[in-house]
Amino acid sequence: MGGISIWQLLIIVAIIVLLFGTKKLRTLGTDLGESVKGFKKAMNEDEPKDAEFKSLNKDESATAGSEKVKDKEQA
């Protein structure tokens, strides 16, 4: 009733293909896909940096614990 049927969607797609042509739509899809891949790659590159900080924090806590033991031994 108020929604768009499959036939209406097919007509809209056919009009878009006629207006822009398949070659232009293909290049547009390729450009869009490459930009999404680049965005995902940039998001994945940020994650290991966070992991490095977490590992540094663990190392610092281990050295802080050993320093406390040394302080107790000296006292």
From Swiss-Prot:
**What family name appears in the similarity comment?**
Belongs to the TatA/E family.
**How does this chain sit within the bilayer?**
Single-pass membrane protein
Q: What is this protein called?
A: Sec-independent protein translocase protein TatA
Q: Which GO terms describe its cellular component?
A: TAT protein transport complex
Q: Where in the cell is it found?
A: Cell inner membrane
Q: Which InterPro entries match?
A: TatA/B/E (IPR003369), TatA/E (IPR006312)
Q: Which residues cross the membrane?
A: 1-21
Task: Give the record's keywords alphabetically.
Answer: Cell inner membrane, Cell membrane, Membrane, Protein transport, Translocation, Transmembrane, Transmembrane helix, Transport
Q: What NCBIfam families does the entry give?
A: PRK01833.1 (NF002500), tatAE (TIGR01411)
Assembly information from the UniProt record:
The Tat system comprises two distinct complexes: a TatABC complex, containing multiple copies of TatA, TatB and TatC subunits, and a separate TatA complex, containing only TatA subunits. Substrates initially bind to the TatABC complex, which probably triggers association of the separate TatA complex to form the active translocon.
Q: What does this protein do?
A: Part of the twin-arginine translocation (Tat) system that transports large folded proteins containing a characteristic twin-arginine motif in their signal peptide across membranes. TatA could form the protein-conducting channel of the Tat system.
Instruction: Indicate the principal place this protein occupies in or around the cell.
Output: membrane
Per the UniProt record, one Pfam family is TatA_B_E
| UniProt key word Cell inner membrane | yes
Q: Name one GO molecular function term.
A: protein transmembrane transporter activity
Q: Give the record's GO biological process terms.
A: protein transport by the Tat complex
Region named Disordered = 50-75
